[in-house]
């Protein structure tokens, strides 16, 4: 499969989509991004790298971090993690509080904000500095010691995290948050402020495409069965309340973030990351979604 030719076709045809959508502005540091930016990269388990556009421009991974935090928490807790967070699509916005009261403080899944806060609570109990553990985990996945979080973005998020604080206090009232709220919020904001580029993020998700094993290091991150199940969660819950439409159009397990990035995997074949900061109404990259739809259409490859 000539993935480089496919990426170049996508890069050519995506131009009219750039500049559309709305850059996330509820976090002031993210509002500085340009909706005309675009990068895309594919990495295979054999080490092949295909890229176009600004594929090595750093951006804030935001909710993409939830995938890796969940993986790290599952390493530590195993199946008991699911006693505190569900595995069902939400159908509501990623920062909604609506379902928490009806469901006794148990978030629907680990990829909405409430679920991610529970996951971060797990990490805060297990590590002295959960955000440092996350950064070290990401560095290990991509073999890049320069991966880090942006303190300006983290501070900007901390100053505008009232809704997340409300969720955290609410879940704590149900006994589903064990660490102090500010400890969890601080770690969560720093985790979301990790900066990476498309090539490294495509590389970071490859363990899911490779049965839970990092191809170049041989490190087993999680067992094969949990890797499949985590991919299933990405498929059903990874793109906010637009997961159904995403699966219909793209057909790959994916996780998006309001920084404009989307990562996806095709088991046995590749990890892919696309980045363009202009977002649709659900908080997914407008051009990124279109690019991934074209990728699976032009390659004829999806999980279906």
Curated annotation (Swiss-Prot):
The similarity annotation says: Belongs to the glutaminase family.
Query: What does the organism's lineage look like at the top?
Result: Bacteria, Pseudomonadati, Pseudomonadota, Betaproteobacteria, Burkholderiales
Q: Which PANTHER family match?
A: GLUTAMINASE (PTHR12544:SF29)
Q: Which residues bind substrate?
A: 63, 113, 157, 164, 188, 240, 258
Provide the assembly information. Homotetramer.
Q: Does the UniProt entry include the keyword Hydrolase? A: yes
**GO molecular function terms noted in the UniProt entry:** glutaminase activity
Q: Which organism is it from?
A: Ralstonia nicotianae (strain ATCC BAA-1114 / GMI1000) (Ralstonia solanacearum)
**Cited Gene3D superfamilies:** DD-peptidase/beta-lactamase superfamily
Which Pfam families does the protein's record reference?
A: Glutaminase
Q: Which UniProt keywords apply?
A: Hydrolase, Plasmid
Would you tell me the protein name for this molecule? Answer: Glutaminase
Query: Which Enzyme Commission numbers does its entry carry?
Result: 3.5.1.2
């Amino acid at each position: 499969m000539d993935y480089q030719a496919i990426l170049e076709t996508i890069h050519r045809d995506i131009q009219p989509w750039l500049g559309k959508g709305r850059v996330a502005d509820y976090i002031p540091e993210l509002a500085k991004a340009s909706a005309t930016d675009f990068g895309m990269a594919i990495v295979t388990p054999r080490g092949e790298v295909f890229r176009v556009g600004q594929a090595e421009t750093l951006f804030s991974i935001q909710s993409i971090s939830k995938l890796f935090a969940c993986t790290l928490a599952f390493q530590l807790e195993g199946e008991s993690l699911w006693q505190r967070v569900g595995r069902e699509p939400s159908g509501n916005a990623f920062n909604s509080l609506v379902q928490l009261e009806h469901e006794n403080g148990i978030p629907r899944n680990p990829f909405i904000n409430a679920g991610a806060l529970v996951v971060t609570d797990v990490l805060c109990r297990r590590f002295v500095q959960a955000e440092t553990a996350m950064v070290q985990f990401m560095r290990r996945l991509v073999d890049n010691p320069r991966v880090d979080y942006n303190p300006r973005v983290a501070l900007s998020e901390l100053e505008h995290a009232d809704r997340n604080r409300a969720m955290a206090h609410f879940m704590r009232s149900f006994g589903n948050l064990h660490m102090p709220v500010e400890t969890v919020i601080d770690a969560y904001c720093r985790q979301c402020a990790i900066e990476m580029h498309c090539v490294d993020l495509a590389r970071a998700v490859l363990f899911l495409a490779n049965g839970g094993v990092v191809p170049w290091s041989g490190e087993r991150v999680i067992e094969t069965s949990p890797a499949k199940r985590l991919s299933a969660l990405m498929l059903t819950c990874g793109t906010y309340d637009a997961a159904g439409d995403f699966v219909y159009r793209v057909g790959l397990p994916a996780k998006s973030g309001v920084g404009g990035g989307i990562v996806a995997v095709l088991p046995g074949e590749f990890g892919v990351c696309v980045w363009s900061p202009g977002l649709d109404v659900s908080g997914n990259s407008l051009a990124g979604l279109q690019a991934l739809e074209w990728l699976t259409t032009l390659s004829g490859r999806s999980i279906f």
